[in-house]
Amino acid sequence: MNLRGLFQDFNPSKFLIYACLLLFSVLLALRLDGIIQWSYWAVFAPIWLWKLMVIVGASVGTGVWARNPQYRAEGETCVEFKAMLIAVGIHLLLLMFEVLVCDRIERGSHFWLLVFMPLFFVSPVSVAACVWGFRHDRSLELEILCSVNILQFIFIALRLDKIIHWPWLVVCVPLWILMSFLCLVVLYYIVWSVLFLRSMDVIAEQRRTHITMALSWMTIVVPLLTFEILLVHKLDGHNAFSCIPIFVPLWLSLITLMATTFGQKGGNHWWFGIRKDFCQFLLEIFPFLREYGNISYDLHHEDNEETEETPVPEPPKIAPMFRKKARVVITQSPGKYVLPPPKLNIEMPD
């Protein structure tokens, strides 16, 4: 196991998001079951931490951008900086929605349509951000998620305000369409993994990659779909489960997503103005980590060890030739020794 290879593609931004969502879902399940009696402002603490890190990271990155104009000419620096600003704008709208949700739950004095208003603005902004991201070859997962769920946001707000009286199974029809697409993606990876396993022309590394992708998508999509079905059945009154068993599949999906962040790219380098990979940044701050980052473990059979211990004979060395005038030492390669040309005397005419 090579620790350097494990952490070189680590994505700290996504790891932070998934970790905060996992902790928030745990606290929310405990609060809904009455195990803890915290205020919802405290239950949303992981969400506040997530948004705080986004705001601080963007502020520091903007300060570094403003104080160092020479950085703007480095490759795709402008594209990454604009991507960071787009992400900050969307996160601020999400923060407004989350604050309104907490206020609505604690006081209950305004309509849910007003609470969901920031999400109604997020969706068109996310569509524009997705178009911009496709043009500049940027991956915008959060923006895509917000843009495709605009109809779902409207249905949920109308159902909570009792403007429509549909069962939750019907309200979540846009969600079922999205999950059907994700199930097709899982099926695609499974089929390709089987084909790569049966093919003899594919190297082992490609087989492992496709199998890992198939297992990862299965571990993400199947528990997530299970969680959504259990939650909808509970809201419709078809089961009497407590919230903790319902949230367990969601926790499994989030843990899998956290594990996948170790094999993805490092994300935007302008967060906190570090301008480099996160692991390289940590190694520069904490030099003692380099000793552990350079450790790798390699398991061999005994036959391989005996083969490695056998010394390899070195080729014979030929003594160097010296030229006195130029004072240059020339070392001849083994088996390619060439005699020097004979001395040529040129007589000058009288």
From Swiss-Prot:
Regions that span the bilayer: 16-36, 41-61, 81-101, 111-131, 177-197, 211-231, 240-260
Start and end residues of each stretch annotated as Mediates interaction with MAP1B: 298-350
Compartment(s) of residence: Cell projection, Dendrite; Membrane
Principal subcellular localisation of the protein: other
The entry's keywords: Cell projection, Membrane, Transmembrane, Transmembrane helix
Top-level taxon of origin: Eukaryota
GO cellular component: dendrite; membrane
Bilayer topology: Multi-pass membrane protein
InterPro entries xref list: TM_Fragile-X-F-assoc
Family annotation (PANTHER family): FAM11A, B PROTEIN, TRANSMEMBRANE PROTEIN 185A
Subunit structure: Interacts with MAP1B.
Family, as annotated: Belongs to the TMEM185 family.
Protein name: Transmembrane protein 185A
Lineage per the UniProt record: Eukaryota, Metazoa, Chordata, Craniata, Vertebrata
Gene: TMEM185A
